[in-house]
């Protein structure tokens, strides 16, 4: 699902965007593709090799598609969330001790909210982000800064 599902969706979207072309009254771009990745696109995760590998695959999928579709005025980017308060990671923040341990990985010292991701997606789909393509934007409170090295390693 992580990689194949996104490939199938973006393939069909790209076909439709190319068919329609740019419609200046709607947008500067013919289309915008937003992939969902994760901080594990760049942070290894032992014990979760299949997940981390699929997220690395999403990065290359998105970058290759961005390169291929840019001449058609189609932008492709990814959002790479860190810890977001959703049911899938509830066990990592079930108790105050577990949440404190999770927050040691997040320099900004808070778990993200689904609205954080939604707001970024809305912005990436807007003409305000028209010159951005082929990029993963990490929405992670600084997890990808590797906070364990903040004190000099």
Map each language-model feature to its residues.
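Short, flexible catalytic-loop segment of classical short-chain dehydrogenase/reductase
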Residues: 59, 80-91
């Amino acid at each position: 699902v992580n990689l194949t599902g996104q490939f199938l969706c973006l393939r069909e979207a790209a076909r439709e965007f190319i068919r329609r072309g740019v419609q200046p009254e709607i947008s500067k771009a013919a289309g915008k593709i937003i992939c969902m990745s994760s901080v594990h696109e760049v942070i290894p995760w032992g014990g979760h090799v299949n997940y981390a590998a699929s997220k690395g695959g999403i990065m290359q999928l998105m970058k290759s598609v961005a390169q291929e579709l840019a001449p058609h005025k189609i932008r492709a980017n990814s959002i790479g969330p860190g810890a977001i308060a959703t049911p899938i990671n509830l066990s990592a923040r079930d108790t105050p001790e577990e949440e404190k341990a999770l927050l040691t990985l997040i320099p900004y010292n808070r778990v993200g909210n689904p609205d954080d991701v939604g707001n970024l997606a809305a912005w990436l789909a807007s003409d305000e982000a028209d010159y951005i393509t082929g990029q993963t934007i990490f929405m992670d409170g600084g997890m990808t800064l590797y906070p364990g090295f903040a004190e000099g390693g």
